[in-house]
């Protein structure tokens, strides 16, 4: 199907920003120029809007198989398209976990049949994600995983982690690690500090993240594996990764929108939708994380989309599930708090949310002639009020509910097909 995007400000991901038209035919970008004329096809007017490479989320929980009451591949990818994502990498903490080629094929087949955007499976490091026996990496890679991770179940044994990294290096697989020392995090549920003491909740010290991160950096340097650090949250973690990069360690890192914008002060009213791992930290940490993005220490912004049922969250804070539903608010949150305030540019947003995560995962991204037409059109200035009840995701667990944000996804195009288009007749900005 032929399509033309007219008069948008195209940020291609390669340094260029210009008002232009984009001609798409059979899912491929055929031309980028001014005043392109065609006799047939779909015409999208992008006047006053940015036309960007589709966002790539390298940390999504789609929950299927096993936890379909929280999310399915269908609802999760619908949420992704609504948020401007054209590709998501799904974590292996399903039931059964993505720890063998059969489950990989299941996820791929459901995604092919019911998915709205492209889904890249991440395989488990250990069988059953129990941290005991290494998975068959060669079979997982052949089946199509883009990385290995035990997600929120950190490998506590340094010896086992070294063996995993050694095999990972052998098969050229990206290792994604959740850095948490369970002996330090214990039963903590929020950032350890003044506020946790004031409101009587058990704290998670920053050392729980930083000690495990330091260990994994040492092992990555020793083995030469490609290491990616999931959702960092502390100033100390930024410093450790910066130093590791300076020493030539093959390391990349991501940070979430909520850890870039919210502090532990948001937990004051015991809203369980603020409960995530890692926890919301302090203003000093946020400033360090933003600086880490700016200087290249942190490579990507990832949602860690973790949908839960209402029952998972409608309990006392210390009993509530960790996790935030983030696919549908990520762009708006980053645009509102970082771009519109001048902390980062829209070009940098494109790097953090599209170009860099794609590069880390080994896939293509960017707008150029001959490339696949994975595109998002956004209005960076339109405002709206977040309404969790309008989420496509089954997970309504967002700390941004009721917040006025600036920046709206207008259209998401995957391989030349419109997968989401904002209905401006029915969706009004709440006043």
UniProtKB/Swiss-Prot annotation:
Pfam families on file: Amidohydro_1
Protein purpose: Catalyzes the reversible cyclization of carbamoyl aspartate to dihydroorotate.
Protein species of origin: Thermoanaerobacter pseudethanolicus (strain ATCC 33223 / 39E)
Binding site for substrate: 61-63, 93, 308, 322-323
InterPro entries to which the protein is assigned, alphabetical: Amidohydro-rel, DHOase, DHOase/Allantoinase_Hydrolase, Dihydroorotase_CS, Metal-dep_hydrolase_composite, Metal_Hydrolase
Coiled coil location: none
GO BP terms in the entry: 'de novo' UMP biosynthetic process; purine nucleobase catabolic process
Taxonomic lineage: Bacteria, Bacillati, Bacillota, Clostridia, Thermoanaerobacterales
Active-site residues annotated for this sequence: 304
Keywords: Hydrolase, Metal-binding, Pyrimidine biosynthesis, Zinc
GO cellular component terms listed in the entry, alphabetical order: cytoplasm
Annotated EC: 3.5.2.3
Catalytic activity, as annotated: (S)-dihydroorotate + H2O = N-carbamoyl-L-aspartate + H(+)
PANTHER family the record matches: ALLANTOINASE
Cofactor(s) the protein requires to work: Zn(2+)
MF annotations from Gene Ontology: allantoinase activity; dihydroorotase activity; zinc ion binding
Family: Belongs to the metallo-dependent hydrolases superfamily. DHOase family. Class I DHOase subfamily.
Binding site for Zn(2+) 1: 59, 61, 151, 304
Name of the protein described by the UniProt record: Dihydroorotase
Cofactor binding, per record: Binds 2 Zn(2+) ions per subunit.
Binding-site list for Zn(2+) 2: 151, 178, 231
Superkingdom of this protein's organism: Bacteria
Recorded metabolic or biological pathway in which this protein acts: Pyrimidine metabolism; UMP biosynthesis via de novo pathway; (S)-dihydroorotate from bicarbonate: step 3/3
